[in-house]
Design a protein with these regions (language model features):
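Positively charged, small/polar-rich N-terminal and surface patches that mediate targeting and assembly
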Residues: 1-123
Length: 123
């Protein structure tokens, strides 16, 4: 099925309306009726200022990048971005078309069996 991947980037400690921003974004997605969203914390990263952030010292807590991701329709991606703009939240985001499916879907291609994909296996 066709979808749009929307990723929004922020520091993990960034807050909005008394909540961590990534939690607020996920909550807003739920309120918009979006079926799922996830937040991922980076191990390390740097942004436009070139400063590398890593979790090495307790003092750096909250400085690592977090990505909040939604796999949605193009219209739902626009709804999320419209809300972010309306709330005047300054974020970097990326958006691209994708296809999604579940491996348990009836029309998913069958996985190759052990005999056909193992070296020296019998067929």
């Amino acid at each position: 099925m066709k979808a749009t991947v929307l990723r929004l980037y922020m520091h993990e400690s960034r807050r909005f309306r008394g909540m961590l921003l990534y939690e607020w974004l996920l909550e807003q997605g739920r309120k918009l009726g979006i079926h799922g969203g996830s937040a991922f914390r980076a191990v390390a990263g740097y942004g436009r200022h070139g400063v590398l952030h890593e979790q090495r010292f307790f003092e750096l807590a909250g400085e690592l990048p977090v990505v909040t991701e939604f796999i949605v329709s193009e219209a739902d991606a626009e709804r999320i971005l419209a809300l972010v703009r309306k709330e005047n939240i300054d974020l970097v985001y990326v958006c691209w078309p994708a296809e999604y499916a579940a491996t348990s879907a009836p029309d998913a291609p069958a996985a190759p069996g052990p005999a056909s994909d193992s070296p020296g296996g019998t067929s």
